[in-house]
């Protein structure tokens, strides 16, 4: 049974599963689907087409599924898809996609989106990511699993943030960030790898040492990207983690943060 505050406004076409809670003065628009156990706090606005999975919690004053401000957007039907077990804190804004890209903005599972963060149109957020307060993603940004973007991080459109990477507070990212890499500054510069995060997630010391050597190959030996990738071919065959690091560099379309 859902628990809906009588002061909430819910469009008749919205679909709410069992166990959904909706707080006072929240507005749930047409085309919104909410999975079981999800809690919508007070003063939240949800606009469709938006599908929200199970056991999420969305806090007050968040705007989720609003039209994109992209000037090319002319009212086409686009969507937002949110997975399960996400926490979306106060004042977060998440926009739907555009037909010029995927027509969809996607947020995976088990993410923490902290207060006043923004996720722009057509962005793709993986699983177990953390966007700290006031982080802002422009349109078309991809953030891979377990990435952490510290407070006030700004990410340029079309950037790709690799898995297990980390940005320091106030970092301005204009190029792709390879997997595992730690970046700081405005403009962002690569400083090291997220070794502490790796240890917390149970990476073996052998894998961490291999990644340390791989980082030095790319960032400390004065090699071109092509030369560094060639040097990483052998350790990539031995360590999947190094292969992930190498692949994130090889697939970069904007160039990597150096």
From Swiss-Prot:
Keywords, comma-separated and alphabetical: Acyltransferase, Cytoplasm, Lipid A biosynthesis, Lipid biosynthesis, Lipid metabolism, Repeat, Transferase
Disulfide bonds: none
Domain of life: Bacteria
Stored CDD domains: LbH_UDP-GlcNAc_AT
Annotated metabolic or biological route of this protein: Glycolipid biosynthesis; lipid IV(A) biosynthesis; lipid IV(A) from (3R)-3-hydroxytetradecanoyl-[acyl-carrier-protein] and UDP-N-acetyl-alpha-D-glucosamine: step 1/6
Statement: the UniProt record of this protein carries the keyword Lipid metabolism: yes
One GO BP annotation of this record: lipid A biosynthetic process
This enzyme's EC code(s): 2.3.1.129
GO CC aspect terms: cytoplasm; membrane
SUPFAM superfamilies: Trimeric LpxA-like enzymes
Enzyme class: transferase
Protein's job: Involved in the biosynthesis of lipid A, a phosphorylated glycolipid that anchors the lipopolysaccharide to the outer membrane of the cell.
HAMAP family: LpxA
Stored PANTHER family: ACYL-[ACYL-CARRIER-PROTEIN]--UDP-N-ACETYLGLUCOSAMINE O-ACYLTRANSFERASE, ACYL-[ACYL-CARRIER-PROTEIN]--UDP-N-ACETYLGLUCOSAMINE O-ACYLTRANSFERASE, MITOCHONDRIAL-RELATED
Protein name per UniProt: Acyl-[acyl-carrier-protein]--UDP-N-acetylglucosamine O-acyltransferase
């Amino acid at each position: 049974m859902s628990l809906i505050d009588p002061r909430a406004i819910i469009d008749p076409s919205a679909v709410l599963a069992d166990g959904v809670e909706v707080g006072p003065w929240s507005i749930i628009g047409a085309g919104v689907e909410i999975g079981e156990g999800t809690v919508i706090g007070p003063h939240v606005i949800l606009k469709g087409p938006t599908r929200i999975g199970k056991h999420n919690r969305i806090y007050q004053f968040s705007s989720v599924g609003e039209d994109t401000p992209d000037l090319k957007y002319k009212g086409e039907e686009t969507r937002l898809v949110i997975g399960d077990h996400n926490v979306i804190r106060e004042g977060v804004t998440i926009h739907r996609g555009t037909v010029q890209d995927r027509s969809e903005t996607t947020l995976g599972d088990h993410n923490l989106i902290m207060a006043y963060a923004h996720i722009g149109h057509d962005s793709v957020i993986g699983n177990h990511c953390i966007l700290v307060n006031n982080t802002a993603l422009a349109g078309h940004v991809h953030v891979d699993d377990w990435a952490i973007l510290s407070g006030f991080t700004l990410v340029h459109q079309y950037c790709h943030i690799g898995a297990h990477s980390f940005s320091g507070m106030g970092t301005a990212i204009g190029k792709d960030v390879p997997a595992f890499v730690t970046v700081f500054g405005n403009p962002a510069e690569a400083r090291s790898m997220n070794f502490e995060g790796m240890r917390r997630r149970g990476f073996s010391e052998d894998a961490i040492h291999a990644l340390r050597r791989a980082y030095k190959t790319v960032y400390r030996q004065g090699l071109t990207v092509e030369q560094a990738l060639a040097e990483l071919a052998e350790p990539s065959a031995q360590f999947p983690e190094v292969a992930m690091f190498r692949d994130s560099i090889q697939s970069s379309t904007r160039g990597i943060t150096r």
